[in-house]
């Protein structure tokens, strides 16, 4: 199959990604937080947080899940929220804790949530 999208790539962009070299998505987030600490990470409405702040919030949420809710690796966490600044904090915090994120639609009825 011809992969015609490669024609639009700059010559410096590789056509293949070594996903094993990247680690987990949490590893990528943590590396980005270290490398781009003072750069904007997320913006929602009129609020922007940088990678350093995002990492602090993620670590705090991870601690909350483990120490207050006593969630363990493999436990599931249903996440029902709109596209807010808190969403990436919750997702990365849960993943960092080894918790499985189960995204749910805020418009689901109680019957659909069963």
PLM features: what roles do these ranges have?
Residues 3-5, 27-50:
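AMP-dependent adenylate-forming
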Residues 104-106:
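Short beta->alpha connector loops at strand-helix junctions that form conserved
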């Amino acid at each position: 199959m011809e992969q015609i999208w490669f024609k639009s790539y700059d010559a410096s962009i590789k056509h293949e990604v070594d996903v094993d070299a990247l680690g987990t998505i949490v590893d990528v987030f943590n590396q980005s937080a270290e490398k781009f600490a003072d750069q904007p990470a997320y913006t929602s409405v009129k609020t922007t947080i940088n990678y350093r702040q995002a990492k602090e919030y993620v670590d705090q949420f991870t601690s909350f899940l483990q120490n207050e809710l006593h969630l363990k690796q493999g436990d599931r966490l249903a996440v029902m929220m709109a596209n807010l600044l808190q969403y990436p904090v919750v997702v990365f915090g849960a993943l960092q804790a080894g918790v499985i994120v189960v995204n749910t639609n805020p418009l689901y009825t109680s019957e659909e949530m069963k």
